[in-house]
Every structure is written in C-alpha cells, then in structure tokens.
Amino acid sequence: MNVILFGPPGAGKGTQAQYVVERFGIPQISTGDMLRAAVKNCTPLGLKAKEIMDAGGLVSDEIVLGIVADRLSCEDCGTGFVLDGFPRTIPQAEALIEILACLGKQTDHVISLEVSNDEITRRLSGRRTCPSCGKGFHVLFAPPRKAGVCDFCGADLVQRGDDHPESICNRLSVYEKQTSPLKAFYAQKGLLRAVDGSLPVEQIQLQIRKVLEGCSSDCA
C-alpha cells in the first residue's frame, strides 16, 4: 500500500501519518528525514546534498529524486510506505511515477487533510514552547497551570516566530500554491481523497482507514 499524505501546517499530518504507520506496518518517509539520513550516512547523493546545503543553496530535484528512489527501494518499503512532504511539484509527481514504475510499484492512495485557514491559525498561533526544557503547551488545548510559565521548570514560555498570524498566513499561502496543482493532478488520476482534518483525531483516523481499506460508510 503506497500512500501520499498532504496537509497544511497544523493539520495534524504527523499524527495521522504515524497512525498509518502503526495500523498498516509501513514506514513513514519524509524528504527532510531522507536528506538528513543520506547526509549522515555519507551516501554519494548525501554528500552532494551536504555540499549544496552548507553553501546555503537549495538541493536540486535531481538529487532529491535520487534520494527518494534510493529510499523507496529499501526492503522496509516492500509492502508499502506513506510519503509525507513529497512530491511538492508536478515535475516531482511525474518523476515519482517513473521511480515507482521502475520498482514495479504505483501510488495507491493520495489523502489530503482539509482544515480551514481559520482553524489552522487557531491551532498554530496558540502554541507555546519552553526555551529551557523544550516542553510544549497550547493556550487553548494544553495550557500551562500558570499563564506564560512552564509547568516543568518555571521558565517563561515563548511563541515560535513562524507561529505568529502573519507568518502562518504566508505559510498557508505557500502551501496552497504548491498543493493546488498537485491535488488537481492526482484528482484527474482518480487517486485523491479529501479527509476532514477538523474532526477529532479518532474520527479522522476512521476516515483514513475507510479510504485505505476500502471500507463502506459503516466501517467500524
């Protein structure tokens, strides 16, 4: 079962990807993790990527696609995988089709977690982090006992720069520009399934299970 998972920042994509991993026994694969692993393991492509990143450049599609191809050919992907954060462009999506074809595979499901911009802003703008011990809080969903103060070490909590409303708006705009063409691409192929990401976690998981297992509406 080969799955691609889309979702804007704050949609809970990581949580749902982990659910797919645990339920179906397939690895979660992200381009960030793949790049870091390739660099750490000093693979030929990893060394090229490190040289570019150290110089402050953007890693080319050629290198990224090579790393993706290497990762998808690993033994643990034999029964499937869930791709997180890839592809990001139509050329990458087209190249992924070729990579999978060379491995005798194809994309089986493309899931898009749909959450309104207002809800995303509410989720992200409420996040707070302790700069001392690293613990995370949320002003609405997991508030500290004393406002603005870490429960564990007493340090003042901070808000990440990219969790400010202006930054969130920019991130959502970038996401929309990236994924709208991809959604159309996969919808045309009959692979795209939208899942309501504003529901409680368990209900989102049930929707994803229905998609991946082909369950009817009464699947429990």
UniProtKB/Swiss-Prot annotation:
Catalysed reactions listed for this entry: AMP + ATP = 2 ADP
Gene: adk
Pathway as given in its UniProt record: Purine metabolism; AMP biosynthesis via salvage pathway; AMP from ADP: step 1/1
UniProt-listed Enzyme Commission number(s): 2.7.4.3
UniProt xrefs under Pfam families: ADK, ADK_lid
HAMAP family in alphabetical order: Adenylate_kinase_Adk
Binding site for AMP: T31, R36, G57, L58, V59, G85, F86, P87, R88, Q92, R160, R171
Protein name: Adenylate kinase
Species, as recorded: Pelobacter propionicus (strain DSM 2379 / NBRC 103807 / OttBd1)
